[in-house]
Amino acid sequence: VTAAGRAAARLAAWRPHAAAVYGSGLWALPEGARVEDEVPYDALGWPAGAVPGHQYVVRLAVVPGDAGRELRLALACGRPHLYEGWTEEELETPVRALAAAGVTRLVLTNSTGALRPPAAPDQAVVCSGVVDLQRPPAGEVPERLVVCRDEDAARVAGALGAAAVPGAGTYVAVCGPQFETPAEVTWLGRYGDVVGMSAAPEARAAAATGVECCLLALVANVAAAVSSHEDVLSAGGRLAGLLAAGLVPAVLARWPDLLEG
């Protein structure tokens, strides 16, 4: 058995109720969580990028729940990006590996830019779909990947209260690494509410492996009002707090029967 195989077996033995992939600067643990194990991406054979704000480690954490029940989470703290030179297949590796380890529920998170109201900084937009502009469109309209049903996204947004924009949103995935110009923001706003440089490969891998999803796009800035990755990371501390408070409520709202039985 290879080292990567042994590391993958640790994930499978953990039997998480759900997993989450954390975006730039968003690695804060859920409130009340304790970490019981850590597995570096390298040990799993997963791609580990070089962009600041990502830790490239899977944390296996437990969050105490009601009636003595505990929520087991696999938290993938960091993601590689298309603009770093990774292939789509490589970017799908973490989600496919989590699925192979028995994960059937996944929360994707990222730091994102607002394209149009009501999306605004320091709020979450719970997205039911991803418009994939990282791939050339087959026709006149870009491909839209389904993340979850609109009603599921709206239920999660409701559980987050004032921290989230009500209802379901749409995320637009672009290649990067450059940030959007005002003209591009106007055009992209025809397709979605928020924009970022991730999520499409993961959503595609989740659909292919039967993993149920939820996408929390945490708004770091108004698109076209940011000039560097450092600007995004400066908002990360605020957004990490939002995610620390909101991840477990989001998971339990998306899958209400998760801890039953």
Give short role names for the model-derived ranges.
Residues 197-234:
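Zn-dependent metallopeptidase/amidohydrolase metal-coordination segment
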Residues 173, 194-198:
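Catalytic beta/alpha-barrel core
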Residues 223-261:
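His/Asp/Glu-rich mid-to-C-terminal helical/loop segments that flank catalytic regions of hydrolases
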Residues 147-190:
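Active-site rim beta-loop-alpha module in soluble metabolic enzymes
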Residues 104-105, 193, 212:
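Short acidic/polar active-site loop segments enriched in Thr and Asp
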Residues 98-102, 189, 207:
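Non-catalytic positions within long, well-ordered alpha-helices that form the structural scaffold/packing
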